[in-house]
Amino acid sequence: MGLTIAQKIIKEHLLKGEMTAGSEIALRIDQTLTQDATGTMAYLEFETMGIDRVRTERSVAYIDHNTLQSGFENADDHRFIQSIAKKHGIYFSRPGNGICHQVHLERFGIPGKTLIGSDSHTPTGGGIGMLAFGAGGLDVAVAMGGGAYYITMPKMIKVNLTGKLRPFVTAKDVSLEILRILSVKGGVGYIIEWGGEGIQSLSVPERATITNMGTELGATTSIFPSDDVTKAFLEAEGRGADWKPLASDPDAEYDRIIDIDLSTLEPLIAKPHSPDNIAKVSELKGTKVDQVCIGSCTNSSLYDMLKVAALLKGKTISPEVSLSISPGSKQVLAMLADCGALSDILASGARVLECACGPCIGMGFSPNSAGVSLRTFNRNFEGRSGTADGKVYLVSPETAVAAALTGYITDPTMLGEMPKVEVPKQFKIDDSAIITPASPEEAKDLEILRGPNIKKFPDAKPQEDELSAELVLKVGDNITTDHIMPAGAKILPYRSNIPYLSQFCFGVCDKTFPARAQEAGQSIIVGGANYGQGSSREHAALVPLYLGVRAVITKSFARIHIANLINAGIMPLTFQNPDDYEKIDQGDKLTIKNIYAGMESGAMTLIDETKGLEIPLACAFTDRQIAILKAGSLLAYTKEENA
């Protein structure tokens, strides 16, 4: 039997385990990336390992999230990251150089390599043929130290693309179509591999848009072949030597095959407040729009920006709409300036923002009260924009421009003929904003710079054989890490300060949670299906740990979050019968006995002391995960292993 693209890369990097779906495997990691909202914690964790220099082929620290410096906190954290990067062999991408995934694609991505990043949209690298995973910061820290990255061997979905996209229909619409087909839970446990003759018409940035939003499916990762299109992109970046061909075997087997004819697609839109709440743009025409944001790691490439500039050229945006443009990198911005496209954007009335994440994470440009905001981003979770009652829709750059010009949701095909856009065969290369690390000899004398906002992370709490605790919070389905640990301009600067962050934990769901959790001492959370979807932020585990949460019981978990819970020492459990979720209530006193035996057998019993009920629970821990929980955290376990 032949192998898929992903299976070939896994086989080449396999350190432990068997390539059997559902079993645990350990992978050698070639590259890592961090961003500053999660990176500070990752580097604090790396420091505690006592390793002088990273042991990956390439590790890069990006500053792209906390670029709004309204106080000392972000600037201090950036100095810390820059100093630790220089000392420990990590490349440092300065603020303003661009969004981590866009810059990594441009300057560091290599087909066939493995990459993990402390950002859930790291699978963007799949657009260039990398096996790229989003992970918690602790997993990234371990990988930087030369440790393996452990995952459950995924199943495989093949998406066959045929035909070509029509004018005004884009890669973003392909992403929204697969979300319509699979939903935000449909990719859990799968790697999604894209192929078929239709991919030949998709550039690397378009492919990266699609793999980027594979994260919204819950997929382990997504990947495209490495072909002549990939080669042309790398040559344009002056990195032709990094190219190698990569394709699935003709007799490769997949667990599911989905066929999409690109020529049949039309402009799509994701309505509030979920990326899979899909409709045709034409069905919502006439909806008044207050704000339009174009950019993010999903749609900020040179190709996207050139199309936006061409559509805006000679026109003026609606006086009722505020339009922001965030180029994905300094390279993109410089090339827009060189060819005159930036002038066309400015002349239209658009506001050009820094090359950073910005509005996507609620870092500025929040919509007005109850405002309708069309965004070319990847998530539209409630409150994520920074406006609690904001209504965020996800669209392509073309649909975004149509709304900016008309003031209403408008099918972009109504704009007339799509202007022809030519991407240069050679990109402008300027790596002056990427700081290379010091040599091992120079690094010995370098000091790590720490600001007062950097606090110690929570101590490990070894899992005991019995747990008695209050059910301090009960939540529903599709709880995101934005619900658990919100982002935004007011909170993100404190990502290195767990005690301060704790007062915002679950604030979207229940503002009384932090105080009640601390009063309880130790507690349990109960959730519905797909608990922990969204961002890879390990703070959604570390902050509940700090507040005394010892177990989370749900109908099901998102992949990255369940790993982060285990890494933090919080026990993730599921109901054997999902209907039992309805039987227990917030405030109930709960007990779980014989936990160690249950970890081994995969079954435990939850005793609801308040109601006199016994409820069967399930778990599926590997021997390694059991050892992590007993040690209290992945960090404590790693220290024990290296002692």
Where are these regions (language model features)?
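Fe-S-dependent hydro-lyases/dehydratases of central metabolism
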Residues: M1-A643
